[in-house]
């Protein structure tokens, strides 16, 4: 326990070595208390592709807030860290680095290339862990996992083999999305569709007998070398007589048949479509129905192969131009129709994908999806926050396609299938015995292993492992809405299939971090923010405060430095009031302060302001805890901010100066006790969000770490509505006088006459009993509080609940301006009355709302009417003065 805070809040000093101290003290590990309820979270594993961005900071801050609070509440918490190998993304990064030296992965070979990728992984994993430390992420590093760890690899192999045995993983030749740059297959959700400028190329296919030509149109003329038919609708009278005949494929000059198929739409274009089964998913199905050949005319790098004839070796887009030119030369080009159309692009490399016939491995999704959908109607369902994302999840599951899981990469989980020279295939968790077997060179989609993350990290398939039995299913997952299908849905159906239960109880969905203008952050816009730059300038606590308070669950948040300034200012305020309290503490211990607070609550010591702040503290604890439980961190933060800044700092701390500057030593001890006790509860409430600064201040007056200190709970003894109402009225009076002074530019230092008229005897007694506070904050020359006060002829006035306040200012006041002010105030009360009246005239509200809520509205109506009537009277009095 240290003894003094620095005069100025400096986050760099506060946060410098704190994280290492936490690690050295092992405060992030599970408590091991078997009597405590377990609460576990697995980190959304960041890709080892580079440094973390603001989205990653959000992904880790929110679950860290949750786990820190649960740890303080006495749960046996596990916050498990780890990283994802991110197959295609990481391999692309390493290949780009090698390309700078003119080296390709093929130059190195698989083994040496993978050595380079592991070097990359080690480099960036260290960077990511350093960033986690700077953000204060309270994970248990003794359980750190990586998706290519042997334990996780074992789980991947078992899942693959089990699904294969059930017939839910199969190998087949189908049209898939092909990334020519990465030279790998992609799943549908790894394809981003963008509107691009393109064209419909219209060309003539001449009938075999030369009697007429059929006009077809395509956006990809370079694929025509793979055409194996043209199709017309069987009900299209224009072409019925041509079905079964042949046309001549231009340039290639080979015959292809005219087939009848519903795929051809008579209403679209000429009603004739070219069929390229190896390069279009719809054409592939037509080809299957008509037993057409499948002619692949492209290499895996997007260049044309030998079947493209003179265009072989050309890039597909160069071949497009050359093909169109050739069609024009031979008179087969009809027209080029410019248009904008949607083209799929690889999410990772950004290049246009190529629909391509390829032999791949697939997961049959039908039954897995049905199981996931059905589970959402059981007690074991996954709860989404906000709930609307449950509908998003179900929609995707209801419309899911088979999942292509093989990738033509080297970095990843190699598919556990082996082939021999006889054409036999073996699928198993271990390599087959004997010689002559060669393992499938493809690897699995990164999301295949990520889908097992919640249970593979806990030791599965060893269901007897201590972590699996204790911490699985996990409690909460935090992630962005953009990967609900990529990751969340897959974890759900894989967990249901292999563990028999949901992978997590709750899923908290957050949005995206956008720039100040609402744009998505991207390299192309140059608007990305490095979170470490923000931490260096403002501190991690300020960034965590922004990330937790920026938006509601599921909503995007806009980053701005103005918001960061506000966050820093708030922490600076906390620092300054903490310094004030600790400087006036006189060695008082927290234990003794807590005992003295008991005397305050039972009325044996202290004053009404002490009981007021404890009452409000109690309400704050209740509301913050309630909103934390609903993952409404923004609401909880707003409540904390208002209590700390407005009620505690601006009011209570100022009110205590009346005692601390007095000669009453016994009363000073009580005031110091309430200050320290309240500060301590504030720091504990704030700790999950602001771990660094709260630990620093906590260490000034307490032993141990705030990380494992008890989280505040509601104390019924603090409930004191009388003190609350009284001090709120006192605040209203002081505010009214201050506002009136400000309106007529009367300096606070100038003594004035203050008249307080009230017919409420209890309020009159309360004001008189606490007149010292009124005098301290309003600086009156004369202060009169009575029910018998005559309304002055010329005075500033204000109406508060239960009282009227007059400030005789005849020589300072402009009557016309005061009248305008009163009319404005009258309009305000009328507006409030209209709002309440509308609610109370709504039968559905009165009948269905809770009785206490309805009564609250009725109380408001009485209060507003009283203020309205008093304001009307003051207007009449002012109007008399004018006359």
UniProtKB/Swiss-Prot annotation:
Gene behind this protein: valS
Coiled coil feature spans: 809-883
UniProt protein name: Valine--tRNA ligase
Domain comment in the entry: ValRS has two distinct active sites: one for aminoacylation and one for editing. The misactivated threonine is translocated from the active site to the editing site. The C-terminal coiled-coil domain is crucial for aminoacylation activity.
Gene3D superfamilies for the chain: HUPs, Isoleucyl-tRNA Synthetase, Domain 1, Valyl-tRNA synthetase, C-terminal domain, Valyl/Leucyl/Isoleucyl-tRNA synthetase, editing domain
Short sequence motif 'KMSKS' region: positions: 520-524
Recorded catalytic activity of this chain's protein: tRNA(Val) + L-valine + ATP = L-valyl-tRNA(Val) + AMP + diphosphate
Domain of life: Bacteria
Chain residues that bind ATP: 523
GO biological process, one term: valyl-tRNA aminoacylation
Assigned EC number: 6.1.1.9
Function: Catalyzes the attachment of valine to tRNA(Val). As ValRS can inadvertently accommodate and process structurally similar amino acids such as threonine, to avoid such errors, it has a 'posttransfer' editing activity that hydrolyzes mischarged Thr-tRNA(Val) in a tRNA-dependent manner.
Entry's Gene Ontology cellular component terms: cytosol
GO molecular function, one term: aminoacyl-tRNA deacylase activity
S-adenosyl-L-methionine is among the record's keywords: no
Any one Pfam family match given in the protein's UniProt record, by short name: Anticodon_1
Subcellular location: Cytoplasm
């Amino acid at each position: 326990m240290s003894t003094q805070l620095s005069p100025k809040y400096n986050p760099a000093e506060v946060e410098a070595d704190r994280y290492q101290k936490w690690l050295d003290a092992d405060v992030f590990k599970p408590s091991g208390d078997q009597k405590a309820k377990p609460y576990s979270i697995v980190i959304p594993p960041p890709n080892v592709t580079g440094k973390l961005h603001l989205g990653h900071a959000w992904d880790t801050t929110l679950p860290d807030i949750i786990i820190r609070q649960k740890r303080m509440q006495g749960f046996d918490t596990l916050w498990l860290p780890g990283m994802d190998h991110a197959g295609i993304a990481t391999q692309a990064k390493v290949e780009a680095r090698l390309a700078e030296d003119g080296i390709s992965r093929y130059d190195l070979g698989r083994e040496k290339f993978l050595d380079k990728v592991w070097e990359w992984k080690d480099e960036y994993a260290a960077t990511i862990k350093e960033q986690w430390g700077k953000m204060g992420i309270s994970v248990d590093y003794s359980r750190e996992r990586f998706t290519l760890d042997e334990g996780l690899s074992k789980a991947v192999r078992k899942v693959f083999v089990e699904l294969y045995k059930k017939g839910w993983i199969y190998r087949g030749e189908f049209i898939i999305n092909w990334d020519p740059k990465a030279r790998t297959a992609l799943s549908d959700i790894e394809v981003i569709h963008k509107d691009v400028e393109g064209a419909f190329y219209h060309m003539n296919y001449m009938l075999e007998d030369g009697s007429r030509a059929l006009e077809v149109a395509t956006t990809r003329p370079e694929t025509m070398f793979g055409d194996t038919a043209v199709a017309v609708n069987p009900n299209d009278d224009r072409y019925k007589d041509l079905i079964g005949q042949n046309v001549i494929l231009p340039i290639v000059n080979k015959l292809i048949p005219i087939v009848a198929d519903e795929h051809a739409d008579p209403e679209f274009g000429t009603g004739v479509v070219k069929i390229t089964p190896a390069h279009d998913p719809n054409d592939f199905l037509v080809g299957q129905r008509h037993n057409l050949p499948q002619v692949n005319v492209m290499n895996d790098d997007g260049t044309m192969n030998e079947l493209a004839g003179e265009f072989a070796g050309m890039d597909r887009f160069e071949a497009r131009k050359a093909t169109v030119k050739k069609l024009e030369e031979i008179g087969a080009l009809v027209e080029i129709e410019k248009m904008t159309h949607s083209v799929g692009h690889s999410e990772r490399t950004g290049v246009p994908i190529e629909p391509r016939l390829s032999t791949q491995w697939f997961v049959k999704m039908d039954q897995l999806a049905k199981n996931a959908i059905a589970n959402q109607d059981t007690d074991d369902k996954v709860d989404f926050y906000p709930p609307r994302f449950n509908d998003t999840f179900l929609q995707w599951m209801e419309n899911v396609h088979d999942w292509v899981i093989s990738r033509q990469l080297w970095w990843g989980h190699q598919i556990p299938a082996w082939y021999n020279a006889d054409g036999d295939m073996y699928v198993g968790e271990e390599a087959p015995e004997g010689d002559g077997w060669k393992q499938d060179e493809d690897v699995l989609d990164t999301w295949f292993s990520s889908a097992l993350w919640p249970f593979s990290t806990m030791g599965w398939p060893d269901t007897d492992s201590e972590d699996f039995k204790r911490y699985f299913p996990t409690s909460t997952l935090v992630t962005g809405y953009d990967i609900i299908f990529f990751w969340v849905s897959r974890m759900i159906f894989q967990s249901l299939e292999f563990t028999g239960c949901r992978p997590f109880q709750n899923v908290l969905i957050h949005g995206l971090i956008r720039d100040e203008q609402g744009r998505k952050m991207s390299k192309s816009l140059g608007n990305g923010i490095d979170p470490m730059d923000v931490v260096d300038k403002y501190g991690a606590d300020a960034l965590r405060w922004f990330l937790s308070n920026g938006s509601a669950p599921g909503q995007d948040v806009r980053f701005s430095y103005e918001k960061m300034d506000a966050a820093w200012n708030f922490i600076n305020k906390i620092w300054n009031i903490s310094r004030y309290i600790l400087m006036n503490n006189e060695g008082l211990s927290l234990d003794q302060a807590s005992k003295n607070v008991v005397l305050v609550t039972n009325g044996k010591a202290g004053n009404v302001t002490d009981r007021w702040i404890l009452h409000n503290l109690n309400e704050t604890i209740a509301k913050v805890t309630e909103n934390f439980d609903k993952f409404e961190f923004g609401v909880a933060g707003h409540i904390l901010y208002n209590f700390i800044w407005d009620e505690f700092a601006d009011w209570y701390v100022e009110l205590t100066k009346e005692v601390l500057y007095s000669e009453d030593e016994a009363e000073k001890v009580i005031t110091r006790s309430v200050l320290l006790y309240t500060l301590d509860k504030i720091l504990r409430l704030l700790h999950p969000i602001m771990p660094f600064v709260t630990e620093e201040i906590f260490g000034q007056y307490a032993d141990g770490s705030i990380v494992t200190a008890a989280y505040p709970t509601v104390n019924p003894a603090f409930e004191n509505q009388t003190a609350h109402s009284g001090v709120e009225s006192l605040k209203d009076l002081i505010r009214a006088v201050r506002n009136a002074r400000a309106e007529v530019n009367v300096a606070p230092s100038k003594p004035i006459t203050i008249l307080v008229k009230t017919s409420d005897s209890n309020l009159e007694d309360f004001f008189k009993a606490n007149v010292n506070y009124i005098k301290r904050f309003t600086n009156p020359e004369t202060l009169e509080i009575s029910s018998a006060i005559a309304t002055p002829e010329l005075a500033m006035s204000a109406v508060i609940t239960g009282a009227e306040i007059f400030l005789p200012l005849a020589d300072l006041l402009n009557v016309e301006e005061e009248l305008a002010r009163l009319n404005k105030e009258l309009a305000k009360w009328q507006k409030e009355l209209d709002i309440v009246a509308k609610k109370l005239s709504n039968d559905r509200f009165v009948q269905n709302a809770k009785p206490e809520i309805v009564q609250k509205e009725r109380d408001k109506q009485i209060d507003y009417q009283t203020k309205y009537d008093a304001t009307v009277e003051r207007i009449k009095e002012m109007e008399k003065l004018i006359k």
